[in-house]
């Protein structure tokens, strides 16, 4: 529901016949510290996502599930949609996690990556144990928050030591591989994400910049290295933008073929569209149609997953602390319909907001919708943790004290799974 009309509807419900105040559909109805309405509008029910947040879900019945309060486990209720357009699911999405950033630091949207600005989330990167502890963060996210997937962004230039089309640099790949192996050791899925915006130093891959052969060389080497690791997920490219989508789809096809031919025959590969991978533009900008033609060498689309991003601020940039939308009506609902019609799946590999109440409300609503539609949405990965510190507007980096970690409010309220 449009937030601008929600206060008017709420006021009307109070004035009309002296009725008890009711929360509107998708509005917050409970949680630790909540002092607003706890009764939901007719046709919806209050659903507890976790101890910090509950919301009014339309057309709901209740089922029992387990959530994690600050001091230990408890039993609460979670609402599940019974609408035929959004098939109910009690288990939610398969994958939930966070980006562990740092190897991508220094990369800008024109595909320039200054390797001297890389800030790896490896505690012992220089042997002095004073770098961010990305592996420790992942261990916390798995053990305390029930997370199952991590995206590990890295710049193309870093991996090949600025040698376009060259071999993986032995020093660089060994450092990056420490993060990958740390992720794998936790039993999680690990997304290798090339964070170059479909570019190298300003030139678009396969469109006047690096050749497809130079790009597939990178992916052939990475796929060969991780071919035996079933939980390594290949994220072809971060946020392509301003590309010819049909030409880009042809590039993606070459990469998929190269990965499979390198021996990584069954792992997940995520296919990114145009317009910064926007979930809201995936259909309208032609990405869905173009990338639907990408196949494995045998002609199947098994484990080829559409890769989308969506932030919750006013301009979808992920640069503002406050959130203004839950992205359901404008992005995830129409995309879910298209995915079902075409028997495909997608994963949300970047989403985030500030650690403020507006984002807790909107993000929890967005995550709840993805969980209710897990037949087409495989999961979500928040942005971001790793080498981000507490001053970053979208930080999801937990703070450590001794052997314990404390999550940000957005993670504990919305992204955590237990």
Swiss-Prot record:
Q: What are the protein's UniProt keywords?
A: Carbohydrate metabolism, Cellulose degradation, Disulfide bond, Glycoprotein, Glycosidase, Hydrolase, Polysaccharide degradation, Pyrrolidone carboxylic acid, Secreted, Signal
Q: Show the segment(s) annotated as Catalytic.
A: 92-418
Where does it live in the cell?
A: Secreted
Gene3D superfamilies in UniProt: Glycosidases
Q: Which residues carry this modification: Pyrrolidone carboxylic acid?
A: 22
- Coiled coil (residue ranges): none
Signal sequence annotation: 1-21
Q: Which domain of life is it from?
A: Eukaryota
EC number(s) on record?
A: 3.2.1.4
Sum up the protein's function in the record's words: Endoglucanase (EG) that cleaves the internal beta-1,4-glucosidic bonds in cellulose. The degradation of cellulose involves an interplay between different cellulolytic enzymes. Hydrolysis starts with EGs, which cut internal glycosidic linkages to reduce the polymerization degree of the substrate and creates new chain ends for exocellobiohydrolases (CBHs). The CBH release the disaccharide cellobiose from the non-reducing end of the cellulose polymer chain. Finally, beta-1,4-glucosidases hydrolyze the cellobiose and other short cello-oligosaccharides into glucose units.
What family does the Swiss-Prot or TrEMBL record give for this protein?
Belongs to the glycosyl hydrolase 5 (cellulase A) family.
Q: What is this protein called?
A: Endoglucanase EG-II
Question: What is the taxonomic lineage of the source species?
Answer: Eukaryota, Fungi, Dikarya, Ascomycota, Pezizomycotina
